[in-house]
Amino acid sequence: MSNVVPTPVFPLFAQPFATRLERALQHLRIGRPVILMDDFDRENEADLIVAADKLTVPVMAQLIRDGSGIVCLCLPGETLDRLELPPMVDSNRSRYSTAFTVSIEAREGVTTGVSAVDRVTTIRAAIAPGARSGDVVSPGHVFPLRAQPGGVLTRRGHTEGSVDLAALAGLRPAGVLCELMNADGTMMRGASLERYAAKEGLVALAIDELAAHLQARGATGAPAELAVAA
């Protein structure tokens, strides 16, 4: 018997995956956020993701306002190694092995680091071509996450999904995410997620269908392959 959890069937997922994927990639290319859901038997959370290349202050404000406030920058290992960002802990015992590094702030151009403007400044400093360890300091108010090699074909997490989608869109393999939350502090799911997506005009994808799409095309998760796998 298959252990694959089916993609949820409700209006957010009513359109065929190929249609939603193309819309999602178009949105990412112009700096609009996309909803990415993981499996029901995993975190069962909806994250708002945006391509780091296209991040703007208004979208960052939306992530902070409508999400948990923990804004994460998802990057391949080679980028984090160039920035010399070590893991947050020596032994990762979190339930889903979420690979946080130490938190960061831009060395220049920020005040307290908390505002939407400051967090965008930090992310731009971290993903700039040729960025090095001296361009960011720790601790800070942006939380980098190390995406596993192979992307969602290796680990079915929002971290890997956001990096894979950015690469599929032809952008730098770097994503920014924040978990969506309701006003009462509960995670946004079901009807509340439907209402939010309709109000904001957002497209939704599920990690299981993204993984199936990449596997069907023989992609290995390498950014160069993903750029032509859409």
From Swiss-Prot:
Residues engaged in binding Mg(2+) 2: E43, H158
One Pfam family named in its UniProt record: DHBP_synthase
Database matches in SUPFAM superfamilies: YrdC/RibB
Pathway recorded for this protein: Cofactor biosynthesis; riboflavin biosynthesis; 2-hydroxy-3-oxobutyl phosphate from D-ribulose 5-phosphate: step 1/1
GO terms classed as biological process: riboflavin biosynthetic process
Cofactor names: Mg(2+); Mn(2+)
Binding annotation for D-ribulose 5-phosphate: R42, E43, D47, R155, R156, G157, H158, T159, E179
Record field: catalytic activity: D-ribulose 5-phosphate = (2S)-2-hydroxy-3-oxobutyl phosphate + formate + H(+)
GO CC, any one term: cytosol
Claim: RNA-binding is one of the keywords in the record: no
Site positions (Essential for catalytic activity): H141, E179
UniProt entry keywords in alphabetical sequence: Lyase, Magnesium, Manganese, Metal-binding, Riboflavin biosynthesis
MF terms in GO: 3,4-dihydroxy-2-butanone-4-phosphate synthase activity; magnesium ion binding; manganese ion binding
Sites where the protein binds Mg(2+) 1: E43
Assembly and oligomerization: Homodimer.
Function as written in the Swiss-Prot or TrEMBL entry: Catalyzes the conversion of D-ribulose 5-phosphate to formate and 3,4-dihydroxy-2-butanone 4-phosphate.
Family: Belongs to the DHBP synthase family.
Name the record gives this protein: 3,4-dihydroxy-2-butanone 4-phosphate synthase
Organism per entry: Bordetella pertussis (strain Tohama I / ATCC BAA-589 / NCTC 13251)
Gene, per the UniProt record: ribB
